[in-house]
């Protein structure tokens, strides 16, 4: 794994850390940081909020609110849109300050939009 992956993982994890006190921290390891809400989904499992996972080829940032509320992506910056894989995953080998700012704002909007299910 490239050394940049460690730095990228730490930066992405720091986006999620402020939300942890209102969530369930499922994983907090050097490779995986995962937050669930306190709400149970129809399948009986907790509803995911967000996660960061370090893989072999990239570091992934998952943000479930954009899956539930796709209109949150309407004004997404092109440099972040290029990083998307699927409906709620962003992949990075490295990340710059502009991308970090965009993800911070998107995460904040996702949290605010889903506040009713996040705080249950």
Region spans (language model):
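Charge-dense, helix-prone N-terminal extensions
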Residues: 1-120
């Amino acid at each position: 794994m490239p050394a940049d992956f460690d730095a990228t993982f730490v930066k992405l994890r720091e986006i999620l850390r402020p939300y942890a006190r209102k969530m369930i921290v499922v994983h907090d390891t050097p490779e995986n940081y995962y937050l669930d809400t306190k709400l149970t989904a129809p399948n009986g499992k907790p509803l995911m909020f967000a996660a960061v996972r370090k893989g072999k080829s990239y570091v992934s940032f998952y943000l479930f609110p954009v899956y539930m509320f796709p209109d949150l992506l309407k004004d997404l910056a092109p440099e972040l849109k290029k990083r998307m894989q699927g409906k709620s995953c962003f992949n990075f080998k490295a990340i710059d300050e502009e991308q970090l700012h965009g993800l911070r704002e998107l995460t904040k909007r996702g949290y605010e939009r889903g506040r009713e299910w996040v705080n249950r």
